[in-house]
């Protein structure tokens, strides 16, 4: 409770200091602006097939991205919102802090979905309210959180994603092709058109923070990592908290957590921004 109160006090400090910039930030009010409408849209159209990640393709089987986690957030008041996550141990999921509290709306429970290509049906489902946001989270920085779950049984469709090693913390991964995945939208136009909850993926190149900064008015910090939006590929509404992974030293590792995208829209060919996992390894390892 003390940590939650501290986070709220820190948020109020930033809100007072930066005024309207807080309300205009990508994470502020995520659930009411993005998560709740997206959850309703998915529930209404779940039987249809369409793309999710912008510019991507549908994942063919649950064992293709077995570390992918779907998160259904139950909010104060009872509405549902959606996010993504990554399974990093049998009892831990890594996601974005704003999936639990976005500065405006707080979740009261997560339904964790594992081993499924759809978020509202299928797979292994666990409920939990045991979530730890980074203690220094604010509307722009440290957008990362731990979700504690009952120990899951690993299988061909439920697997862990490896974390970078200490020796890999200096790696920036610039120019490397990375994999993004999620249950979110694939276009800015997707509102009530036929769609589905099918998991989708796309390959995108990691770019330097300097190049990324050119597309944003807010500061891109060293604790962020960005991917190019060339060809309209990138993350979209509902993908928050999901994984950014690369193959490095012959193993796939988690290097980013979906945080925010361009204000111009998902198809603006602008970069997607992630929380850089290597910047938080000490905190992550202390919570495993």
Q: Which positions does each model-derived feature cover?
A:
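Protease-domain processing segments flanking chymotrypsin-fold serine proteases, especially trypsin-like
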Residues: 2-94, 110-114, 197
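Extracellular/periplasmic catalytic domains that process cell-envelope and extracellular macromolecules
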Residues: 59-64, 87, 104-106, 120, ...
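Conserved H-D interstitial segment of serine endopeptidase catalytic domains
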Residues: 71-74, 93-96, 100-139, 146, ...
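Catalytic nucleophile loop of clan PA
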Residues: 80, 86-87, 171-173, 233-258
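Active-site-proximal beta-strands of protease catalytic cores
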Residues: 90-97, 175-186, 245-264
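Chymotrypsin/trypsin-fold serine protease catalytic domain
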Residues: 126, 144-151, 156-231, 277-278
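Extracellular collagen-like Gly-X-Y triple-helix signature, i.e., selective recognition
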Residues: 197, 208, 247-288
